[in-house]
Amino acid sequence: MARNVNCVYLNKEAPGLDFQLYPGDLGKRIFDNISKEAWGLWQQKQTMLINEKKLNMMNLEDRQFLEQQMINFLFEGKQVEIEGYVPPVED
């Protein structure tokens, strides 16, 4: 049976993550409060951030920057700013 969470990002009850994907207290907070759908949205933004800003995940400062962006996106409702990205226009 799927585990549901009250997703703070989507502001609705939705299927939760199957297991804790991120370490520590923040990982527990994500597991308890973020849905699979919201996590998938974050992963798309994360990939774009890493590529556009040429982040190196071996660099502590880059990992800290990415973690702060994740907190802002998932818990504070702030959109990720990606320079030069223009969303596709739907017809």
UniProtKB/Swiss-Prot annotation:
> What's in the keyword line of the UniProt record?
Iron
Q: Which InterPro entries match?
A: Fe_traffick_prot_YggX (IPR007457), Fe_traffick_prot_YggX_sf (IPR036766)
Function, as annotated, reads: Could be a mediator in iron transactions between iron acquisition and iron-requiring processes, such as synthesis and/or repair of Fe-S clusters in biosynthetic enzymes.
Question: Family per UniProt?
Answer: Belongs to the Fe(2+)-trafficking protein family.
Biological process (GO) annotations held by this record are: cellular response to oxidative stress
What SUPFAM superfamilies does the record point to?
YggX-like
Q: What protein does this entry describe? A: Probable Fe(2+)-trafficking protein
Query: Per the record's keyword annotation, is Iron included, yes or no?
Result: yes
Q: Which GO terms describe its molecular function?
A: iron ion binding
| Segments forming a coiled coil | none
GO terms for CC? cytosol
- Fetch the PANTHER family from UniProt: FE(2+)-TRAFFICKING PROTEIN-RELATED
